[in-house]
A protein has these predicted regions:
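Active-site/ligand-binding surface loops and adjacent short beta/alpha elements
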Residues: 4-48
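Generic secondary-structure boundary/loop-capping signal
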Residues: 9, 14, 52-53, 65-68, ...
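A general structural signal for short secondary-structure junctions and capping/turn motifs
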Residues: 24, 34-35, 56-59, 92-95
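Hydrophobic residues positioned within well-ordered beta-strands of beta-sheet architectures
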Residues: 30-32, 66, 101
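Glycine-rich active-site loops that engage anionic ligands at enzyme catalytic sites
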Residues: 36-79
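Short alpha-helix capping/helix-loop boundary micro-motifs
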Residues: 83-88
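Short Pro-Gly-centered flexible turn/kink motifs
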Residues: 91-108
Length: 109
C-alpha cells in the first residue's frame, strides 16, 4: 500500500508512523489517496480547499488502518494555549455568521 497524490507516492511501511502523525500544509494536489499497489484499489479524498491534511495510523493488530483527515485549522499543542481564541489558525464565527465545508471520499475498485 502507498499514499499517493498527483505528484508523489509514499510507501506505507510499518515505521512510517513511529513518531505519531504527519501534518502536511498547503498541498498543491486536489486529492490524496491510499492505494493498494497490487490491485489499484484506492480510498481517495478530495482535499481541495483544506490547508492542512493529517495522516495517521495505529498499525497494531488486529485492526491496521491509515486515516486521512483534511483540516481547516491545526490541533491544539500538548502544552499550548487552552483557549480557542489563542490557538494558531483556529477559526471562529461571530454571532449570526455561518460556515460550511464538504469532504468527498471515493472508494475505487
Amino acid at each position: 500500500m502507498c499514499i499517493r497524490d498527483s505528484t508523489r507516492t509514499v510507501p506505507l511501511t510499518d515505521d512510517l508512523f513511529d513518531y505519531d502523525s504527519h501534518c502536511m500544509l498547503n498541498l498543491r494536489s486536489k486529492t490524496l489517496a491510499i492505494v493498494e499497489k497490487d490491485t489499484g484499489r484506492a480510498v481517495r479524498c478530495n482535499i481541495e480547499g483544506y490547508p492542512y491534511v493529517l495522516i495517521w495510523s495505529k498499525p497494531e493488530n488486529p485492526y491496521r488502518f491509515v486515516c486521512i483527515e483534511p483540516w481547516h485549522s491545526l490541533p491544539g499543542e500538548e502544552n499550548g494555549p487552552l483557549t480557542w481564541e489563542d490557538r494558531p489558525c483556529a477559526a471562529a464565527l461571530h454571532p449570526g455568521e455561518t460556515w460550511s465545508t464538504t469532504l468527498c471520499t471515493t472508494f475505487e475498485r
